[in-house]
Amino acid sequence: MSTRTVKVGGIDIANDRPFVLFGGMNVLESRDLALQVAESYVKVTQKLGIPYVFKASFDKANRSSINSYRGPGLDEGLRIFEEIKRTFNVPVITDIHEPHQAQPVAEVADIIQLPAFLSRQTDLVAAMARTGCPVNIKKAQFLAPQEMKHILSKCEEAGNDQLILCERGSSFGYNNLVVDMLGFGIMKQFGYPVFFDVTHSLQMPGGLSSSAGGRREQVVQLARSGMAVGLAGLFLEAHPDPDVAKCDGPCALRLSQLEPFLAQMKALDDMVKQFPNIDTA
């Protein structure tokens, strides 16, 4: 099976390469906290030899409640991202929600992300693709993995083949998500790098009435399962104190657990990618 390589700075992202980490926090809560989180990730990933891209949102436009915290907004968010890039010399990934945000975000971010809920919005997809920036496409909770080929085609038609697919769980009844491990293999057949967003796959959407619940206690088991497939990368959110995080705290890893967690993921990835392929078709 052929696999494309997406290049971000000095990082090669591909299903047959050592895994890349898209890691950070769910939403920018403050400049100081963002710098603290980025510094922790940089120290751990450098120690373990894991290629790293910082991630966070400047606006959470799809919160459950009108009263929920959304973020600092586009302008302040981009200023924080620029400072993180300067300070730590790392690439940045962030998501957008409207077509007019694509170009200004692409001028700062190294990867722009298509949110799962918006992944079929053609105008948004086309605007992101036309920037020429690599695009991380989140698989919607309501889409089958086979359907992701249509979103890839929209990006390709707009002239962009620097594309990444990202699994983040599928709706399973009300207030629940599950991960179909067979979906990774289906999406890998399209030839693009495939990531696993283990954090959001642990969500229980609307599970706390006015916000999403989560199952942080199962993050290690689920991440191990995904990494055993042999993926281009892992998408992870961590927080110094998840219980007071302003968004998706119930899913976030404790920042203090980052090193032992990533050490396990790297060991598993290294082992899996040493195995020869067995064609059972």
Curated annotation (Swiss-Prot):
Broad class of the protein's primary localization: cytoplasm
Cited Pfam families: DAHP_synth_1 (PF00793)
Pathway in which the depicted protein is active: Carbohydrate biosynthesis; 3-deoxy-D-manno-octulosonate biosynthesis; 3-deoxy-D-manno-octulosonate from D-ribulose 5-phosphate: step 2/3; Bacterial outer membrane biogenesis; lipopolysaccharide biosynthesis
Annotated GO CC locations: cytoplasm
Top-rank lineage group of the source organism: Bacteria
Catalysis performed (reactions): D-arabinose 5-phosphate + phosphoenolpyruvate + H2O = 3-deoxy-alpha-D-manno-2-octulosonate-8-phosphate + phosphate
Disulfide feature: none
GO biological process, one term: keto-3-deoxy-D-manno-octulosonic acid biosynthetic process
Cell compartment(s), UniProt: Cytoplasm
Keywords noted in UniProt: Cytoplasm, Lipopolysaccharide biosynthesis, Transferase
GO MF term (any one): 3-deoxy-8-phosphooctulonate synthase activity
Stored InterPro entries: Aldolase_TIM (IPR013785), DAHP1/KDSA (IPR006218), KDO8P_synthase (IPR006269)
Keyword Transferase: yes
EC id: 2.5.1.55
Top EC class of this enzyme: transferase
Sequence similarity: Belongs to the KdsA family.
Name the record gives this protein: 2-dehydro-3-deoxyphosphooctonate aldolase
Native source species: Hahella chejuensis (strain KCTC 2396)
The organism's taxonomic lineage, starting at the top: Bacteria, Pseudomonadati, Pseudomonadota, Gammaproteobacteria, Oceanospirillales
Gene (UniProt): kdsA
